[in-house]
Amino acid sequence: MHNIVAVSSKIAVFVFIRRRLFILKKKPLCVKLLQVISMLNFKIDDLSVWEKLKETTEPIIMYGTGNGADKVVDIFEKLDIKLSGVTASSGFVRERFFRGFPVKSMEYFEEKYGSFTIVITFGTSIPDVMNNIFNIAKNHRVLVPCVPVIGTEIFDRNFLNSHTEEINLAHALLADDFSKKIFEGYVNFQFGGRIEILKEIETPESEIYETVLNFNEEETFVDIGAYRGDTVEKFIELANGKYKKIIAVEPDFKTYQKLIKNCENLKNFTSFNAAITDFDGEIGFSSLAGRQSAIGGENMIKSLSLPTLCKGYEPTFIKIDSEGCELEILSGGEEILNKFKPKMNVAAYHKSEDIFKLPILINAINPEYKIHLRHHPYIPAWDTLFYCV
């Protein structure tokens, strides 16, 4: 039954977006935006990262051996891209194999090949690890074949051609030129995979809070995807410890226990072990490590819509980082977004289509929102977020 509900939910979101796009087409402001031709309104690389790897004559060395690496190898096999070896950070080499390849040090491949292309297949925001990757890029071509955190649709040429109109519309809806520059870089990185693009578009997280989000002592913060309380802690710091209410939600039970432990001494704090979607009831949930936890699976947990979660409160700031359910949460939260117009921080990177579907949906729900985009230091382009005010 819960699978039927989940499918129905996705259909409802699709219908909602199509209905809203139809309405947008009727508005004079948006007619011009929708009159686009089958090309992007900004320049990107001529070849996708997959096409670059298919055409290269250099050996291809994979850096990383986790879940993302498995996904990339599967696509390599499908596209007949030849992999020549696998490497890892020095502490993770050891005597082991990955997908039939012995995991070797970078020095081993330097000596064996001299010149080669490196593909990054893991995620990190650790400064030392990121700096090491950027240093490697000074001597070798480093590409990042992006695979979505949730879903299987990659940002290749077919994907780009299928969604050109939506990408152009989302780009036009952004509130400022800086956000548009970041959007252009993000799309180019997802498509072309050049590591240096990330350096060009990254900003420290403090910048957006200092220039766009202004907190006061009356903030009611709703943290959807609160994890262990890291963003609660960050909010309190940014609000100088003065706020009205914090509501934190985390679907994973073990992580939720750490959340309530870390926040047990906070004043005016309420927490829920639940998933926020577009309906009230129950939904399947897969409790896996880190970013692999997601909606779908045999473990049934409580599901709440945003209006139900916020009943009795007037949210002023909502963070949504829900491993791929952002569209459903927003569509189910239309009442909240229209009634209170809370400031929002919405993850833009879980699914390939999030980068354009999310701003289109937000604008369709409440056209008064000014939508900003930022990418904070991370490889690949995770921690790319919409900030709406």
Question: Residue ranges of each PLM-predicted region?
Answer:
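Positively charged N-terminal leader segments that act as targeting/secretion signals
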Residues: N3-F14, R20, P28
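Phosphate/nucleotide-binding beta-alpha loop and adjacent structural elements of enzyme active sites
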Residues: L24-L83, S89-V389
